[in-house]
Curated annotation (Swiss-Prot):
Entry GO MF terms: cobalt-precorrin-5B C1-methyltransferase activity
Family: Belongs to the CbiD family.
Keywords (A to Z) from UniProt: Cobalamin biosynthesis, Methyltransferase, S-adenosyl-L-methionine, Transferase
Protein name: Cobalt-precorrin-5B C(1)-methyltransferase
Amino acid sequence: MLEMYVNCDGKKLRCGYTTGSCAAGAAKAATYMLYNEEILDLIKIDTPKGIELMLPIENIKKGDGFVECSIIKDGGDDPDITNGIEIWARAEVKKEGYTLKGGIGVGIVKSEGLYVEKGDYAINPVPRLMIEKEVKKVLPKDNGVLITVFVPKGEEIAKKTFNPRLNIVGGISILGTTGIVVPMSEEALQQSIKLEMNQKIKSGIKNFTFLFGNMGEDKAKEMGIDPKGFVIMSNYVGFALNCCRENNIKKILMVGHIGKMCKIAAGCFNTHSRVCGVRLEILALELALMGADTNFIEKIYREKTTEGAVKIIGKEYKDIYRRIGVKIMKKIKDFTYGEVNADIVLYSMEKGILWDSREVI
């Protein structure tokens, strides 16, 4: 177990190691045991982060001209679906040279725009380098080895990852840029946004719909919006908009719950609650600007949720949603220095669509 910790919102969280580190360790151990009689319990690898890992070997299978071994993915306190999955590597005797391929449970890339070529196994560049480097440390001179990375439960697990969205089929990806999993890593989430956008751009998609999560995705599908252009941006609105600028995307659609979208109206481009908590404040401010009674404004402000506030606002002040929507559109344009224009859809869970800028004549 990796005894490395980070502080997240005052909580001490344990770091872990990536699927890439597991694959590198399993491949190194299998190669060593292929050419040596010794049976290993642990294998040491270096990571790009500069941290040395001592990884426990879970299972070993030896046969004529091959060795297979596995390492359990330990993501620490990161809530990743691959945590606890068994990553296997098979080392086979080869006359000369080094070859790496994927096997069962490792996805195959079916689209361009990702870090791996279309048609190849989804073993990302850094893990590829890690595996090769570690294997060659123990590969005897003038001998060769064929390494196959496989994940028996990979196809099942992959259904709950980003891979179906990225058109990676048949299994999980072998990932990791540092070899270390940092719990709640913003970098990992942002990388998912960038990857998804790149893949869609390469496949010729021009109409992008940005969503905060699964609820927004369901609402957008319900509205009949083409899901091929969906991008889940989570709380990273600013990052997603910067990706648009980098890729010369001039026009987007953003669909979001009124609670999240209010934050953008206030100029917050990271909508996580610990970064930006203004929601009811924006509703109260707009009502004040519309001339609402002070007691009514206070009632809205005292509500626990924006859903509750929307129920109270009713039809009398329904123009509030247009006003907020227009502000969001302006904030997005200002944030991107005029390079990105956005259409906006605001919704609540109970009332449905509150305002859709595309319906404004």
